[in-house]
């Protein structure tokens, strides 16, 4: 589902954006900066809003798309996040960006598209909370070898995970691995998981094929 809206700017008689203080000063233009500095300013605004809503900011990116920017915000929580929650976060982030621009000037120079979503199945598991939130899923991961052994690939089901290690069930049995021993994990798509009947959770599994489970977009 994608819900789109448009935020309007004050315009003059010609329909172009009204300049409230003559030509933009060199200092104001420099606030646009490069993508890295814009991302840093966005992070300052967005992360507190997402945290206050009770979610984790998993990723924040900004890129060019023609004549506008695309701001992508990925959020998650224990138990996942549904479309209604994504929409709530999208509105809160949009309002915070509006307020920040009123107070501090352009956060993102020019028009931009705001996209808020939950992580898709393609998101690599790099933090303890990523592994914890994927308990029960089949994961493929690289096990780092020691000085006398090379890396190897391992496929196993996530049994449990804490801040120190993850326990995986493999064909060889159950074993715990510290995160330092593992590379990023990759969730493997399954049509039927153990303990599920065919078709019982088909609607849930269909979402595994999307890069983002739920997306809320707003054009600005």
Curated annotation (Swiss-Prot):
It is found in: Cytoplasm. Residues 1-35, 184-220 are annotated as: Disordered. SUPFAM superfamilies: YhbC-like, C-terminal domain, YhbC-like, N-terminal domain. InterPro entries: Ribosome_maturation_RimP (IPR003728), RimP_C (IPR028998), RimP_C_sf (IPR036847), RimP_N (IPR028989), RimP_N_sf (IPR035956). Keywords: Cytoplasm, Ribosome biogenesis. GO terms for biological process: ribosomal small subunit assembly; translation. Its main location: cytoplasm. Residues 1-15 have a biased composition (Low complexity). GO terms for cellular component: cytosol. Residues 198-220 have a biased composition (Acidic residues). HAMAP family: RimP. Belongs to the RimP family. Required for maturation of 30S ribosomal subunits. PANTHER family: RIBOSOME MATURATION FACTOR RIMP (PTHR33867:SF1). This is Ribosome maturation factor RimP. It comes from Salinispora tropica (strain ATCC BAA-916 / DSM 44818 / JCM 13857 / NBRC 105044 / CNB-440).
């Amino acid at each position: 589902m994608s819900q789109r809206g448009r935020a309007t700017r004050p315009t003059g008689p010609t329909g172009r954006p009204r300049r409230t203080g003559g030509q933009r000063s060199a200092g104001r233009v420099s606030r646009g900066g490069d993508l890295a500095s814009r991302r840093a300013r966005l992070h300052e605004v967005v992360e507190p809003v997402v945290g206050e809503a009770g979610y984790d900011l998993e990723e924040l990116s900004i890129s060019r798309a023609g004549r506008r920017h695309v701001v992508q915000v990925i959020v998650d929580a224990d138990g996942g996040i549904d479309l209604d929650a994504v929409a709530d976060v999208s509105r809160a982030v949009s309002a915070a960006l509006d307020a920040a621009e009123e107070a501090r000037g352009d956060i993102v120079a020019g028009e931009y598209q705001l996209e808020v979503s939950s992580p898709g199945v393609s998101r690599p598991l790099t933090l303890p909370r990523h592994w914890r939130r994927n308990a029960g899923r089949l994961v493929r991961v690289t096990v780092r070898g020691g000085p006398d052994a090379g890396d190897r690939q391992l496929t196993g089901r996530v049994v449990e995970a804490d801040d120190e290690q993850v326990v995986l069930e493999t064909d060889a049995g159950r074993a715990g691995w510290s995160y330092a021993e593992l590379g990023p994990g990759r969730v493997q798509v399954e049509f039927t998981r153990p303990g599920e009947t065919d078709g019982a959770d088909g609607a849930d599994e269909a979402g595994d094929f999307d890069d983002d489970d739920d997306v809320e977009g707003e054009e600005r």
